[in-house]
């Protein structure tokens, strides 16, 4: 007769986890009891395995149980039986392995030196490595020493054969990855008593490797800043240092994790060693930055270069350039109230209420008509009701902090009997802005994360010999349209002006002049400090002038166009004109300002030499023309069995001024593309305007 009893707590976790580490996690929360009546040991262990949904692998071991056995956990139950009946046990892959203690053995397993650490990690991850049994490594020789039950040693040996050893001669070397857009090294911004550190690609990659090697996820990591492992920003002296936002460059964290797992588990991936040095395996991987060449240096196996390239490509992406124009001004609160009353909803230029600047309230205002608002401010500045404190402008990359600081530092001396300390006290106006470009329904917008501190050093009311600091802080974020402005107010101040009026000469007479010929007056004015921030999208790191409507290239083209008109009266198109026409034709629209011609004024083959493998279809063509130039559209076809590229340089005749192919320049066998060719009208050239008769008799001009 046998009977099994179990007590399960109310919060017991399920007994079938996906991966068991040596012993099931549920065993820690479960008590076990077994009531045996002349029960064979094999039968008792089979009942035990059945209760926990496991298989039993056990050779014949003699023993009979005749008692009621209670244990605090299943592990304790097996240990008690093992001591009494001289057997060893371990759990792996939902199987309980039991073997006599006499079958305890040891083995020497040879692996590569780079795979020693990875074999131990792999055995731990799959739940096979048991700390109760012996384990030792000889990293320089590439040898693992293991001791335990025969079945346990056999499983370890089988796993060691699955670890791929690196090819001969494939030793670690320095791999160089030059960067185009991102910074390889960390950037440090010293900001008063704080230190902002924006991590470079080398630090980000090292942090990713460290985090992933410990089983952590990179989804919550701050990939811009660095202040220790996984933190975004390092504060040099302030615990209230704000964190930088996460990158918006479109990082695919899932792809990054997969690539990192390949690096870390491909023949021994690695992270930076902390503490003692270890030989071989992931401890030998090192990542550093080459500041001179803006490159990332990785010391690892050259065979993993492709894996690192995929990771670095996700980080080395171009970002937008944003210019931030800031206007800091003090304005009389009475005039400000009148100004805000004129800039309400009825004006249609401000997204806010008419009473945004009431007394005792902080203010945030959006301006869309910046020109009219600036005119109002200039008028107030002219009559003395407003004064501009500063008008700085700074250019920065999106998601990178821009800091503007106007501060004053006083030094406070604290003396004692033998010690004198000097503490700096800093106050003033500081502005920290982190911009980010957005696209909402095709309309560009800019998100601003703003931190403002405004303060000044005054004389203390308690001790005249000690300074007093008055500060105000604003931390906010907003999304505004491009070319709009954000106004932040709420910094109130009281300004007192003492004026003395006296009669010349008589007012300087002692005693009498002060009483009879002088008068004093004090004017108190309440002022509010405003911060007007205007972000402008300049471009990106690939083409900084991409978003400039009147950039330098177009200005040069316009001036050259005017010079050409004065020289020969012809109006030749600029690059912008040709690009605009080609874009309209790609979109399926007829070019503006051009009429549809019936036939081409040129022979098809005279426009372009298609080259070997390509042919131009003369039956299918279009011609759009204006007075001085036009665009011919022909069809190019690949007649070969290999991909062929349309070479635009072959369309470089005397009349051609621009060429483009759509939808593809590379044509697969049998594929066709349209070729747009911008050409000058023959009649506008000087040869067409003027003719010269030939001196040869019978020759045609």
Curated annotation (Swiss-Prot):
GO terms for cellular component: cell outer membrane; type II protein secretion system complex; type III protein secretion system complex. The keyword Protein transport applies. PROSITE patterns: T2SP_D. It holds the Pfam family Secretin_N. Residues 229-238 have a biased composition (Gly residues). Its main location: membrane. It is found in: Cell outer membrane. One of its GO terms (biological process) is protein secretion by the type III secretion system. Belongs to the bacterial secretin family. T3SS SctC subfamily. Component of the type III secretion system (T3SS), also called injectisome, which is used to inject bacterial effector proteins into eukaryotic host cells. Forms a ring-shaped multimeric structure with an apparent central pore in the outer membrane. Involved in the secretion of a proteinaceous elicitor of the hypersensitivity response in plants. The core secretion machinery of the T3SS is composed of approximately 20 different proteins, including cytoplasmic components, a base, an export apparatus and a needle. This subunit is part of the base, which anchors the injectisome in the bacterial cell envelope. Forms a stable homooligomeric complex. This is Type 3 secretion system secretin. The lineage of its organism: Bacteria, Pseudomonadati, Pseudomonadota, Gammaproteobacteria, Pseudomonadales.
């Amino acid at each position: 007769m046998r009977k099994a009893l179990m007590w399960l707590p109310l919060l017991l976790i399920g007994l079938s986890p996906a991966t068991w580490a040596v012993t099931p996690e549920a065993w820690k929360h479960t008590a076990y009891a077994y009531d045996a009546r002349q029960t064979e040991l094999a039968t008792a262990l089979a009942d035990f395995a059945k209760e926990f949904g496991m298989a039993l692998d056990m050779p014949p071991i003699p023993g009979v149980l005749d008692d009621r056995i209670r244990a605090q956990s299943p592990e304790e139950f097996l240990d008690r039986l093992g001591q009494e009946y001289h057997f060893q046990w371990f759990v792996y892959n939902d199987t309980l392995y039991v073997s006599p203690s006499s079958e305890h053995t040891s083995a020497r397993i040879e692996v590569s030196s780079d795979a020693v650490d990875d074999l131990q990690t792999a055995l731990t991850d799959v739940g096979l490595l048991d700390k109760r049994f012996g384990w030792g490594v000889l990293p320089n020789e590439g040898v693992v020493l293991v001791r335990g039950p025969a079945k346990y040693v056999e499983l370890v040996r089988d796993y060691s054969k699955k670890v791929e050893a690196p090819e001969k001669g494939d030793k670690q070397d320095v791999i160089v990855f030059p960067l185009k857009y991102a910074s390889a090294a960390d950037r440090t911004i010293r900001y008063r008593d704080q230190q902002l550190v924006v991590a470079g690609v080398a630090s980000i990659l090292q942090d990713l490797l460290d985090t992933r090697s410990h089983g952590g996820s990179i989804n919550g990591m701050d990939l811009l800043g660095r202040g220790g492992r996984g933190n975004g920003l390092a504060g040099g002296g302030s615990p209230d240092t704000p964190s930088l936002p996460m990158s918006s460059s479109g990082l695919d964290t899932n792809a990054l994790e997969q690539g990192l797992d390949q690096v870390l588990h491909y023949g021994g991936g690695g992270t930076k060693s902390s503490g003692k040095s270890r030989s071989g395996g992931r401890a030998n991987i090192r990542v550093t930055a080459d500041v001179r060449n803006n490159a990332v240096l990785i010391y690892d196996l050259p065979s993993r270069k492709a894996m690192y390239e995929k990771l670095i490509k996700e980080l080395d992406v171009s970002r937008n350039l944003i210019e931030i124009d800031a206007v800091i001004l003090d304005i009389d609160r009475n005039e400000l109230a009148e100004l805000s009353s004129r800039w309400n909803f009825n004006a249609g230029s401000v997204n806010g209420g008419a009473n945004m600047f009431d007394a005792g309230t902080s203010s945030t205002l959006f301006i869309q008509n910046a020109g009219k608002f600036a005119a109002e401010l200039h008028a107030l500045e002219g009559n003395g009701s407003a004064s501009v404190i500063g008008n700085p402008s700074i250019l920065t990359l999106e998601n990178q902090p821009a800091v503007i600081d106007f501060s004053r530092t006083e030094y406070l001396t604290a003396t004692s009997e033998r010690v004198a300390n000097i503490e700096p006290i800093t106050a003033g106006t500081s502005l920290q802005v982190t911009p980010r470009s957005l696209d909402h329904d095709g309309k560009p917008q800019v998100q601003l994360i703003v931190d403002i501190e405004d303060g000044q050093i005054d004389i203390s009311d308690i001790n005249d010999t000690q300074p007093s600091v008055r500060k105000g802080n604003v931390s906010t974020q907003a999304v505004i349209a491009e070319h709009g402005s954000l106004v932040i107010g709420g910094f109130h101040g009281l300004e007192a002006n003492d004026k003395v009026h006296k009669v010349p000469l008589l007012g300087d007479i002692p005693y009498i002049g002060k009483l009879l010929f002088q008068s004093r007056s004090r004017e108190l004015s309440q002022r509010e400090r405003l911060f007007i921030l205007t972000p402008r999208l300049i471009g990106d790191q690939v083409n900084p002038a991409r978003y400039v409507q009147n950039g330098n290239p177009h200005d040069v083209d316009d001036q050259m166009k005017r010079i050409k008109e004065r020289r020969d009266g012809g109006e030749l198109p600029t690059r912008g004109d040709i690009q605009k026409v080609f874009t309209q034709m790609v979109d399926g629209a007829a070019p503006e300002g051009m009429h549809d011609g019936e036939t081409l004024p040129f022979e098809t083959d005279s426009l372009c030499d298609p080259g070997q493998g390509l042919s131009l279809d003369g039956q299918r063509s279009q011609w759009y023309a204006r007075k001085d130039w036009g665009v011919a559209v022909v069809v190019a076809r690949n007649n070969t069995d290999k991909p062929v590229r349309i070479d635009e340089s072959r369309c470089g005749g005397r009349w051609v001024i621009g060429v483009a192919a759509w939808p593809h320049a590379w044509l697969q066998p049998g594929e066709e593309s349209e070729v747009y060719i911008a050409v000058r009208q023959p009649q506008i050239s000087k040869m067409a305007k003027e003719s010269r008769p030939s001196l040869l008799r019978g020759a045609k001009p």
